Structure formats: C-alpha cells, structure tokens
C-alpha cells in the first residue's frame, strides 16, 4: 500500500492531472506538440467488457491514450467467445472494438491480482469499469478504494441502470435497456412487432456518453487538481437519446408509435420500394417537396390543397405515400439516383454491407482501418468517424491477444522482477500469451 501511495504522490508532483501545467497531461510546450494526439501521455486502466466500455476506451485510444485492458485469465473479455464468425480462433466481435489496447490477464478475485490492479490505478489517469454496482467494492476496487491511493483518478463506472435505485443491482444488456427505455417500442413496422435495432445502439450511445464524460473529467481534474467519479448507465443514455420522441410525450402527452422507415412528423421522409431495391428520400420543407414532385413527374401534387404544407401532408400521409410508392416502383434504384443527383433533396439507397464498403464516399472518408493482427494477419474494421486537422488517426495497433502484454506491463510499467512474475504465472494469478 505504501508503494502505491508513493507512486500516486510522485504522479501528482510530476504535474500530471494538476491545474497550472502547460498542457493537460505533460509539461511540454504546446508549440512543440502540434502533431501530437490530444491524449498522448494519458494512461487508462480498462476493466470493461463487451461493448459500451470497450467502445469508449477504443475511442480514447484512437486519440493517443495508452489503454491497459484488464481481462480474466483463461477466458478474457466475454466477446472473445462470441461468434461465429471467427477468424482462426479470434472473434470478429472482439476485433471490432479493441484496437489500440494492451491486454493484461489478471485474476482480480485473488488478493495478489487486486494488488496489481491497485498499483496500476496509482499510475493511471482514468479507471473505467462496467461491473454491477458494489461488485468491485467487494474486491477492494471500488471508487472509494481507488480514491484513497489515487486521488487524481477519473473513475468511470458504466452500469445497466445506475449506482442506486430499485434496479441498480441488475446486470445490464443492450437489448434489455433498449426495451425498457422505449427504443424498441418505437422501432419496427407500423403495424408489426417491436424490433431490436440491427446494432447495439444503446451500448454504443452509452460508450459515446462515457467517452465524452471521461474527457470532461480529465479537463475538470486539470482545473481542480482532483479526480472524480462518473456514473454512466445504459438506461439513462438511451432515454436521453429519445430526444423529440420523448418531448412529444412529456410536453404534448402524445404516446409514440412505430413508423417503420417513415417519420412521425415529416412526410414524405421514408424508404420507397423501387423495381430492384429501396430508396430513402426526405422532403423536410415545401420547397423540397415541390422539387421532389417535379423529379417524379407529378407536378399536380405541388398545388394540391391536401399537400401544400408539411402539416397537411402528415394529415394525408396514407394517400400521398400510396401515390409516391406507385411512382417509385416504376424505375430501378440506379435511375432514381441519377434523377435525384444535384437536386438538393436528401436521398440514398438502402445498402447491403457489401454496398456500404464499396460506396465511394465511405472509401473517400477512409472508414476502413487495416491492421496486422499477430495471429490472424491482416484485418479490416470500421475506423474512427472523426478526422482532425493537426494529427492523423493512422497506425492503429491491432486488438491484443489475451494477456499479450502481461509480462511487459508488470516488468516495464510496475517494475516487477522476473522472479515475482514467474511466481504469479505459476500460481495462475496472471497469464501471458506469447506471440511469435
């Protein structure tokens, strides 16, 4: 414990995490750092699994943070076994959200494993976890425990429902939170059953909220010199994302319903079936509706008293959609794409994934990131969505093997000697995966 406190004090004296430094994380002048990624020098201890937490820490890693991923010996992150598909023995699910991380396999149910995590926390800037509230406290790794040895720490807890309250003890999964938050209630065919979104939007939204909250926590620490606790959860994240649908109910007492691909307040704004596929168009104002009618060669609709305003078009939705649907079905998607090009009307096809990753704009935006994995070889995953003018998001490190960096972290970061490391390996407290 004294060793950990000494490291924490040294960390504080170094200027990291204190107000008044030249930069947020280092003492180097900003004029010399134009090409640096903003989180270079930030170290993150990541005890998260599955999607929300790993997605948050992956995004932090993209910005230059050093992410140390703590995993269970033998099994690791739950998603390592999620599949098919697998590439060799690697789950593509795991590969999708774990780039730019180092893996240390530690048994945190063993007191010696807990000590390792505490020693790492003492020299890290951020601690992220997604255990059920109270679980880590039972092991001595809750916020109160870490705050004692690392008062500078930004501690982010990602849960299903929050730290307190009648449901706080429950485990949280995306689909459950999606259902309880109302997202499934508003997703699916108008007259059909509720539908789960095709990707785990609640997990991803929570990951983005956590990502932003951690960034805010680091800035707060820079200003105050003190760490803090962040409570982030799936239910709150998804309810917050209901935006105008929630406001319709809270302000207008209007219960939401499912609209398929359509929009409850804008007409036309939905997918239309063509001869060979689907095209989504949106006419958000009267001018766009007029342009749409001209492209479709239906000029008589422009001045029709039933469709002159969006309010009227919403009232007469079924009749208008029937007319438009019949017209769109007369041509193939490619023909419509040509006709809408340059019109100012928002439009686009419903793409398969094959279509997505051959789409010219997707290729132009550099959204496919390639990496060389130590056992799989070359892999491709979706890359960062945001680009910056002063630094590049290139040269990503591939997702780690389970325990790939255990020995390195213990020896180079915590300064353990080989004898201690060997003893921990033999006892099963840690695991090291050797690469060729």
Swiss-Prot record:
Residues modified to N6-acetyllysine: 392
Disulfide-linked positions: none
Active-site annotation:
203
The catalytic activity of this protein is classed by the Enzyme Commission as 2.8.3.-, 2.8.3.13
**Family of the protein in this entry:** Belongs to the CoA-transferase III family.
Question: What is this protein's name?
Answer: Succinyl-CoA:glutarate CoA-transferase
Listed GO cellular component terms? mitochondrion
Which reaction(s) does the protein catalyse, per the Swiss-Prot or TrEMBL entry? glutarate + succinyl-CoA = glutaryl-CoA + succinate; 3-hydroxy-3-methylglutarate + succinyl-CoA = (3S)-3-hydroxy-3-methylglutaryl-CoA + succinate; 3-hydroxy-3-methylglutarate + glutaryl-CoA = (3S)-3-hydroxy-3-methylglutaryl-CoA + glutarate; hexanedioate + glutaryl-CoA = hexanedioyl-CoA + glutarate
* Acetylation found in the keyword field: yes
Name the job this protein performs.
Coenzyme A (CoA) transferase that reversibly catalyzes the transfer of a CoA moiety from a dicarboxyl-CoA to a dicarboxylate in a metabolite recycling process. Displays preference for succinyl-CoA and glutarate-CoA as dicarboxyl-CoA donors and glutarate, succinate, adipate/hexanedioate, itaconate and 3-hydroxy-3-methylglutarate as dicarboxylate acceptors. Acts on intermediates or end products of lysine and tryptophan degradation pathway, in particular catalyzes succinyl-CoA-dependent reesterification of free glutarate into glutaryl-CoA to prevent renal excretion of glutarate.
User: Where is the transit peptide, renumbered to this chain?
Assistant: 1-8
Gene behind the chain: Sugct
Q: Does the entry feature the keyword rRNA-binding, yes or no?
A: no
What Pfam family is a match, any one?
A: CoA_transf_3
Q: Which GO terms describe its molecular function?
A: succinate-hydroxymethylglutarate CoA-transferase activity
Entries under Gene3D superfamilies matching the protein: Crotonobetainyl-coa:carnitine coa-transferase, domain 1, formyl-coa transferase, domain 3
Per UniProt, the keywords (alphabetical) are: Acetylation, Mitochondrion, Transferase, Transit peptide
Q: Where in the cell is it found?
A: Mitochondrion
């Amino acid at each position: 414990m004294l060793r950990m406190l000494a490291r924490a004090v040294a960390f504080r004296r170094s200027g990291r995490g204190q107000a008044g430094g030249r930069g947020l994380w280092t003492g180097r002048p900003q004029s010399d750092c134009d090409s640096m990624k903003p989180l270079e020098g930030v170290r993150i201890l990541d005890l998260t699994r599955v999607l929300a937490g790993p997605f948050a820490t992956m995004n932090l890693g993209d910005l230059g943070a050093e992410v140390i991923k703590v995993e269970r010996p033998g099994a690791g992150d739950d998603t390592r076994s999620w599949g098919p598909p697998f590439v060799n023995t690697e789950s593509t699910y795991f590969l999708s959200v774990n780039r730019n991380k180092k893996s240390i396999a530690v048994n945190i149910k063993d007191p010696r494993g807990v000590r390792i995590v505490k020693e790492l926390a003492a020299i890290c800037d951020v601690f992220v976890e997604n255990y059920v509230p109270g679980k880590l406290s039972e092991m001595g790794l809750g916020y109160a425990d870490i705050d004692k040895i690392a008062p500078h720490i930004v501690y982010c807890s990602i849960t299903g429902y929050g730290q307190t309250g009648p449901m706080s003890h429950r485990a949280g999964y995306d689909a459950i939170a999606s259902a309880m938050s109302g997202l499934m209630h508003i997703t699916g065919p108008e007259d059909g059953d509720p539908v789960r979104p095709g990707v785990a939007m609640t997990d991803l939204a929570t990951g983005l909220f956590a990502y932003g909250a951690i960034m805010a926590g680091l800035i707060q620490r820079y200003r105050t010199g003190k760490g803090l606790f962040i409570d982030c959860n799936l239910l709150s994240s998804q309810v917050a994302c209901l935006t105008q649908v929630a406001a319709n109910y809270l302000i207008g007492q209007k219960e939401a319903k499912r609209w398929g691909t359509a929009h409850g307040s804008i007409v036309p704004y939905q997918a239309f079936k063509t001869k060979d596929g689907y095209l989504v168009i949106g006419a958000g104002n009267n001018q766009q509706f007029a342009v749409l009618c001209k492209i479709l060669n239906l000029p008589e609709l422009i001045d029709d008293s039933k469709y002159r305003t969006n309010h009227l078009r919403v009232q007469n939705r079924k009749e208008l959609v029937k007319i438009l649907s019949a017209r769109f079905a007369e041509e193939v998607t490619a023909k419509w794409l040509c006709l809408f090009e340059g019109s100012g009307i928002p439009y686009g096809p419903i793409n398969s994934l094959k279509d997505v990753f051959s789409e010219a704009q997707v290729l132009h935006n550099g959204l496919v990131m390639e990496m060389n994995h130590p056992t799989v070889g070359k892999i491709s995953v979706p890359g960062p969505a945001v680009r910056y003018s002063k630094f590049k998001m290139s040269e990503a490190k591939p997702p780690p093997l389970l325990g790939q960096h255990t020995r390195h972290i213990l020896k180079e970061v915590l300064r353990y000697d080989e004898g201690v490391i060997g003893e921990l390996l033999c006892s099963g407290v840690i695991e090291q995966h050797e690469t060729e």
